[in-house]
A protein has these predicted regions:
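Metal-dependent peptidase/peptidase-like ectodomains
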Residues: 105, 136, 217-283, 331, ...
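A conserved hydrophobic secondary-structure block that centers on an alpha-helix together
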Residues: 147-214, 329, 333, 345, ...
Length: 748
């Protein structure tokens, strides 16, 4: 899955001014130069071609073969490595049926057709058919209703037009929110089945030429995926909070709250167009219209009836996590953890293997450094996860199985996933924002010869001038001043989730992209070696660049003699989040008042076309005033403590004794765990982080200050008030730890 944040660089001199670890900078540069000598795009191409040569879904022979090959390479390069096996619930289809039964019978679905020039697209004997994991088996027939993206606002639009999905089958298009929310919301509204299709407006011919002429999604392509309720908890649905070992105590399927109850299947836009072309009912509003050559209707009038059936094998399947370690010389019990998964939905060349082979390049280079006599100060742990695609299974089970040890030893988790051509993107824990920017300034962009940081900054400036997409005002202001661009916040959708949001380790997610066309074949049979090397990253030049970026992060974090964090960046970011939450509350109050006034005045009734009636919005509870004083005070304290610590380290860091440095390293290793609340978030206690979480109705997308923000959005006003206090407490605790660390710097 792809990164979706932004960053740019800053000068090395700024690092020194901030007190960021400058342990023998000449030696560091020499080590990084030696590291770069061992990074080879040719290696990555050879590994990628082999690893993507056959279907490698969880439980497939090639998935296991890839894990064993990765293990052998780690050992060849001098790592202490092993495979840790978990036994995870992984349903696979026994049979799938989707067909229109009225107004005429048309059989739909089936395996994706081969494409000339893409050799692997014809190797389907061992490939699973298009399906989604963790849907509810069933055999249903019902009238079809089009629900746009199938998000909460879409159901409000349907209700205003008098359309009810109860007892019906819905068809939703991919996009806007995470796929698993679409059938979950359909189920919550009484639907008996759900179809999800990829509209060409979002990743097909409306975006680029369709594959194989271009890289966009062709008419027969189907996006697979998981539809379990990941915003409730990721990992094995049967073992929440514990590792899915062979003898683990498991829930029954009926007890597992993340499993759906209704059948769900994905569909190509070639097939979806046949359904939508025959659908009647009201014409869909403009925002609902995609790029198919049909008039988009909402249905609900009994014009189209669909038969949908899924039967699955609900078995436990082995997942093979490859774990490799280089032991630290000074701080062996402080771990810098690096991960990327190796399982795909079919061939998985872009997602995940383009990122995995970049990680393997790093591991090879680090192994060569180790053989030549270099030893990291901290232990480096490299992980190649299995079973990420179904629901972050491999990484989550390992995190849950080793939770106590990880809380005691984990210093940071660095993640990559699919990689492509374009700008560097990053999300993560904001104390590491400056470090990421500094590393980006030291790596050359392979297409332009500029630094990765300079290109990212230029991209922000040019996009803002051209009004291309959403403009991040914070990033724009930073780019205009030549400063650090902000990290994005981490939601979910890749293997960092358990580490930051459940265990409280700081985390980063890094990748290149924006100029590749991997979105067009995402989770399909066409995510292939041919597609990657033709449209996504020819020659894997950006694979090598990713290795150099992440390798530097690992090296600097492993060898840092002084803290690399800038806590002022974190404090400023939290202050900005609080400003957003306050604005959200004020905007909601104003919107509620306007809605109630227009309803009372009959404006919606008078504005509605009598021949195409649209009712007034349903009444909702008025958003009240909130007392944010506790959070205001906590953020003020955090900013003061962060500024004081950063300033003290900049002034005195170089003169600290080794004993002071060791004490600082211990004090700050687990500081991010103070941002957890063991009671967790409302209705989903697995997620414990009170600054970053995946949204309940966004999935992959992050919600910051989630306990407060989501409660306001969902009109759980009592929860909002409670989490003002709970969030304030974790911020005060965090500030107090910074004060203790400053005392160490000052020799107190």
């Amino acid at each position: 899955m792809r990164a979706a944040g932004i960053l740019a660089g800053a000068a090395l001199a700024a690092m020194a001014a901030a007190g960021v670890a400058q342990t023998a900078p000449t030696d560091r540069k020499a080590i990084e130069a030696r590291f770069d000598q061992h990074i080879s795009s040719a290696d990555q191409l050879a590994w990628l071609k082999d690893m993507s040569s056959a279907p490698n879904h969880v439980g497939s022979p090639h998935d296991k073969a890839n894990a064993e090959a990765i293990l052998a390479r780690f050992r060849q390069w001098g790592w202490d490595a092993h495979i840790e096996t978990f036994h995870v619930l992984y349903p696979t289809p026994i049979s799938t049926t989707v067909e229109m039964v009225a107004p005429e019978k048309i059989v739909l679905g089936g395996q994706e057709p081969p494409i000339p020039g893409d050799d692997t697209s014809s190797r389907t004997a061992d490939a699973l058919p298009p399906y989604v994991a963790f849907q509810g088996d069933g055999d249903v027939t019902g009238d079809l209703v089009y629900v746009n993206y199938g998000m909460p606002e879409d159901y409000k639009d349907l209700a205003r037009r008098g359309i009810d999905v109860k007892g019906k089958i819905v068809i939703a298009r991919y996009g806007t929110g995470w796929r698993g929310l679409k059938p979950k919301l359909a189920q919550d509204h009484g639907a008996i089945g759900c179809i999800i299709y990829s509209d060409p407006a979002d990743d097909g011919y409306a975006q680029s030429d369709a594959y194989p002429v271009g890289g966009a999604r062709p008419a027969g392509s189907v996006q697979r995926g998981s539809v379990a309720d990941m915003p409730l908890y990721p990992g094995d649905p049967l073992t929440p909070g514990i590792g899915a070992t062979l003898n683990a105590k498991r829930l029954t399927r009926e007890e597992a709250p993340t499993l759906l109850k209704i059948p769900v299947l994905p569909m190509s836009y070639g097939d979806a167009g046949k359904l939508l072309a025959r659908l009647g009912g009201p014409v869909a509003p403009a925002p609902w219209r995609g790029a198919l050559p049909v008039t988009y209707h909402m249905g609900g009038n009994g014009g189209v009836s669909v038969h949908l059936a899924v039967k699955s094998n609900w078995k436990l399947t082995p997942a093979y996590d490859v774990i490799a370690m280089l032991k630290g010389a000074r701080y062996p019990d402080q771990w810098v953890i690096r991960g990327n998964h190796h399982d795909g939905w079919v061939f998985g060349a872009a997602d995940p293997l383009s990122g995995n082979v970049a990680m393997l390049s790093e591991a090879k280079a680090l192994g060569e450094l180790y053989r030549s006599g270099w030893r990291p100060a901290r232990t480096i742990v490299y992980t190649s996860w299995d079973a990420e695609e179904p629901m972050l299974l491999g990484s989550t089970e390992w995190a849950e199985q080793h939770a106590d040890e990880l809380k005691q030893k984990g210093a940071i988790y660095i993640n990559t996933d699919g990689n492509g051509r374009g700008m560097l993107h990053a999300q993560g824990s904001h104390p590491f924002q400056h470090l990421v920017n500094a590393v980006a300034a030291d790596v050359t962009d392979p297409e332009t010869g500029a630094s990765v940081a300079a290109r990212a900054r230029a991209g922000v400036l040019a996009d803002a001038f051209d009004r291309t997409g959403h403009v991040n005002e914070t990033a724009l202001a930073a780019a205009e001043k030549g400063g650090d661009l902000p990290l994005g916040a981490l939601g979910s959708g890749s293997d960092y989730s358990a580490y930051i949001q459940h265990l409280g380790l700081p985390a980063l997610n890094i990748g290149f992209g924006g100029e590749d066309e991997s979105d067009g074949v995402y989770h399909s049979i066409y995510d292939s070696f041919h597609h990657v090397t033709t449209f996504d990253d020819p020659g894997l030049k950006y694979g090598a660049a990713l290795s150099k970026v992440v390798g530097r992060l690992v090296l600097r974090l492993a060898d840092a003699d002084l803290p690399v964090q800038r806590y002022g960046d974190f404090a400023d970011t939290v202050a900005a989040y609080l400003g957003e939450v306050k604005k959200l509350a004020a905007d909601r109050r104003a919107e509620d008042a306007k809605r109630d006034r227009l309803t009372a005045d009959g404006a919606f009734r008078l504005a509605s076309d009598p021949l195409k009636p649209v009712g007034a919005p349903a009444p909702e509870a008025m958003t009240p005033e909130f007392d944010f004083a506790a959070l205001d005070g906590a953020v003020k304290t955090l900013r003061q403590s962060a500024a004081a610590f950063d300033g003290a380290l900049a002034a005195r860091g170089a003169a600290l004794s080794q004993a002071q440095r060791d004490r600082l390293s211990v004090q700050l290793r687990d500081i991010d765990q103070l941002l957890l609340d063991d009671r967790g978030l409302p209705e989903r206690p697995w997620y414990k982080h009170l600054i970053y979480a995946p949204g309940r109705f966004t999935g992959y997308g992050a919600k910051t200050l989630p306990g407060v923000r989501e409660a306001i959005e969902e009109r759980r006003f009592g929860d909002a008030r409670e989490f003002v206090g709970r969030t304030a407490k974790v911020l005060r605790d965090y500030a107090a730890r910074l004060d203790q660390a400053r005392a160490t710097v000052e020799g107190k």
